Structures are given as C-alpha cells and as structure tokens.
Regions:
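Heptad-repeat coiled-coil signal-transmission/dimerization helices
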Residues: 31, 35, 78-81, 85-88, ...
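Conserved helix-loop-beta segment at the catalytic/binding core of cyclic-nucleotide signaling proteins
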Residues: 44, 68-69, 76, 81-115, ...
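Short, conserved charged micro-motifs
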Residues: 60-64, 115-120
Length: 162
C-alpha cells in the first residue's frame, strides 16, 4: 500500500472543543487560545516560544502484515496514538501544552525555555520515542504572526507522510 490516504481517512479524529476524544490531548481550539496567550506573554517578556511537532511516520510504522488489512492498520494506529500521547505527557512538563492537531500527530507548545533546553528535550524525546515517530522543532520568530508560525510548523508536521 504505497498510498496511505485510505488508511489515514479511517483514523478517528474528533474533539468536543476541549479535548481530543481518542487520546485525551487538548483540542486545536484550546491550543490556539493558549498559544495566543503565550505569544503575548513571550512578546512582553522577550522570551522564546516553540512548537515541537510529533507525528507517526507511516513509512516506518507500517509492517507488511498490517499493510494488507486496512481495519487492523487503523486500529493499530489509533492504539499507537493513545500510547504516544501518554509517552509525551511523561516526557514534557505539565505546563507544556500537548494538542492533537492531525490524524497522525501532535503539537507541543513550549514557552519560556531557551534553545539549549529545547534541544535537550528533543534529544531526550528522540531517545525515548520509537523510531517511527518523527519530531520537528519550530521556534517562533520575534513578532511573527500566529498563522505564519503555524504555516511553518504545518510544513514540518506533514512532510513525513507524503
């Protein structure tokens, strides 16, 4: 199955405005509110703010066995997303905002920590998370608008499963 779009379409992705109903992560609407607040604080205090994008890389995740059965693949991916959310909650600070932004992944908003600390967090995550999980860092440029920043994060987030 070279084209994963059929399987991706089957994956449950719904929220009630507050949380993702599959994983329990924050819903995008909540994430946006927190991001807007943290950007205002970051601009006022001249602190850094970043988003780490975490996504399942289906090219690495899918095995020959589950490529043959779409329903099993869907079920396996959903179970992996739930497991991944719990791993992320253990890896990041309680104050870091974890949101399920797509059918295959999460964004984590990191506020008030410098580039060195972020790189340490990413290093720890790469050692802890499975090989089929892709992570990318996108720091907000000073004065950058929210949507422009999200556009840059989107490019990183969705680049793995094309």
């Amino acid at each position: 199955m070279k084209n994963y779009e059929a399987v991706i379409e089957l994956i449950f992705n719904s929220n009630n405005g507050q949380i993702d109903l599959l994983t329990g992560a924050l819903a995008p609407e909540q994430f946006d509110q927190i991001a807007k607040r943290d950007i205002a604080i970051s601009d006022r205090n001249s602190t850094e703010i970043s988003i780490i994008s975490i996504a399942l890389d289906l090219h690495k995740y899918l095995t020959i066995e589950n490529k043959l059965d779409e329903e099993k693949t869907k079920s396996d991916i959903e179970a992996e997303l739930v497991k991944l959310h719990f791993e992320l909650k253990n890896l990041f600070r309680q104050s870091d905002c974890i949101c399920r932004v797509s059918k295959l992944g999460f964004w984590i908003l990191l506020s008030g920590i410098d580039e060195v600390a972020i790189k340490q967090v990413l290093d720890r995550a790469s050692k802890t998370l499975p090989d089929y999980v892709a992570s990318n860092l996108c720091q907000r440029a000073k004065g950058e608008k929210l949507l422009d920043w999200y556009k840059r994060v989107d490019k990183l987030h969705f680049s793995n499963n094309k």
